[in-house]
Amino acid sequence: MAAKDVKFGNDARVKMLEGVNVLADAVKVTLGPKGRNVVLDKSFGAPTITKDGVSVAREIELEDKFQNMGAQMVKEVASKANDAAGDGTTTATVLAQAIVNEGLKAVAAGMNPMDLKRGIDKAVIAAVEQPKRASVECTDTKAIAQVGTISANSDSSVGNIIAEAMEKVGRDGVITVEEGQALQDELDVVEGMQFDRGYLSPYFINNQEAGSVDLENPFILLIDKKVSNIRELLPALEAVAKASRPLLIIAEDVEGEALATLVVNNMRGIVKVAAVKAPGFGDRRKAMLQDIAILTGGIVISEEVGLELEKVALEDLGQAKRVAITKENTTIIDGVGEEAMIQGRVAQIRQQIEDATSDYDKEKLQERVAKLAGGVAVIKVGAATEVEMKEKKDRVEDALHATRAAVEEGVVAGGGVALIRAASKIVDLEGDNEEQNVGIRVALRAMEAPIRQITKNAGDEESVVANNVKAGEGSYGYNAATGEYGDMLEMGILDPTKVTRSALQFAASVAGLMITTEAMVTDLPQKEGAGMPDMGGMGGMGGMGGMM
């Protein structure tokens, strides 16, 4: 086991504080409408230019191991805020730095660290209730656009495209961000249920220009097994042919004789039919087939529940207004399923999302909700260069998370005003002893840090602005973009309540642990091993000079 280097007390805290300040100083320059860029060197390709706090934090590793521990703890604050609300990483970092700096000053002056931490925790618990009370519901498109704009560093085009996407696919819809091919941002909306399985044979294509299969008002047969024998499908095919409507077969697979017969029937015009594989694998496939059944008002033909393919009747089949199938995707538009059944299924999946532990499972379940309840929108980010594309994509993703948080818990006045108001509401809070009172004051002072940093980045006088805003009430604040004072809600400067709350909670949590640190342990650097001895000359070769 390698030897360790141990530092105690003030020596440890000073080193840790240096690391905190290095990381926080790099991150906080990005805060606010006039936040600056940070350039990140990459081991390959062009450098990345970003205004995203968590991207900057993730890049920082310090050479001094004690300083690095401090930096990594603040990085944890940014990551936790990002995971919880998707935004507010820079605000959380600024708050953590302020609490640690003020708190360690008090510890150096001889205060009890544990009582300081209790005071800070008491102040934060009281403070996070204030934004919740002041929160305004964020339901209309204009407010959503404003939240997106603020989060994307005052880029209104980003706010507008996110608001448009949310309007089209609803709150439960899935919105993804991709790199586009054009200079302008584009929005693609897929209505209905789309899954990534295409036609099983190109001979099903009936729209030659688009290279797709278009079925109008089709029946949909859902089968939870492989089908290779055509005899199993004959009753369903005959029933559909009598009804003179097309048929879409979604099965685990359709192969051999069954597929060949379907192709021949389709080409001869006896019955208009197409077959695709069911989406997903294993249990997820069963669940998605059930989703499609509920959406289209059909049932899944599965031997597990005693349903046989040979005994299928028309009433067992699902229906939709239209189905479009390309080489890669199948889209079912306007299924005829009952609204109550669909809502019940959505509620059931939402419960599974709450119980799910892995992010991957949550993401897949969220996609299923979107396909049942709303739709899927894709924002294609446009830019002139690859460097700009990466920077803009980061901002769009941040803005998207912020708008989701705003829709979930509402919005409060932005620009650091919500924290100033929260601090003013709890200014009379008392701890159990004087040292806890100092902890409360540390937290209250730290809550001014975001507005001070926003003002500083805009090139204005931070103390003047902070005092003017403190003298006001409600949503009165300072618009750093224009240099004007006024009602932040009316000016459209909004922060999601969840983002403000999460930033303060995570910052105080990690900062409290750092204040109560008394020892730090790290590996000693490895000493260079002794090199191999020089190889001497070969003996007996000295007299060879005379042979020349």
Swiss-Prot record:
Keywords: ATP-binding, Chaperone, Cytoplasm, Isomerase, Nucleotide-binding
GO biological process: protein refolding
Domain of life of the native organism: Bacteria
Enzyme Commission number(s): 5.6.1.7
Substrates-to-products reaction catalysed: ATP + H2O + a folded polypeptide = ADP + phosphate + an unfolded polypeptide
One term under GO cellular component: cytoplasm
Binding-site positions, ATP: 30-33, 51, 87-91, 415, 479-481, 495
GO terms, molecular function: ATP binding; ATP-dependent protein folding chaperone; isomerase activity; unfolded protein binding
Matches recorded under InterPro entries: Chaperonin_Cpn60_CS, Cpn60/GroEL, Cpn60/GroEL/TCP-1, GroEL-like_apical_dom_sf, GROEL-like_equatorial_sf, TCP-1-like_intermed_sf
UniProt-annotated location(s): Cytoplasm
NCBIfam families: GroEL, PRK00013.1, PRK12849.1, PRK12850.1, PRK12851.1
Role this protein plays: Together with its co-chaperonin GroES, plays an essential role in assisting protein folding. The GroEL-GroES system forms a nano-cage that allows encapsulation of the non-native substrate proteins and provides a physical environment optimized to promote and accelerate protein folding.
Assembly notes: Forms a cylinder of 14 subunits composed of two heptameric rings stacked back-to-back. Interacts with the co-chaperonin GroES.
Family, similarity comment: Belongs to the chaperonin (HSP60) family.
Record protein name field: Chaperonin GroEL 1
Organism: Vibrio harveyi
Organism phylogeny: Bacteria, Pseudomonadati, Pseudomonadota, Gammaproteobacteria, Vibrionales
Gene name, Swiss-Prot/TrEMBL: groEL1
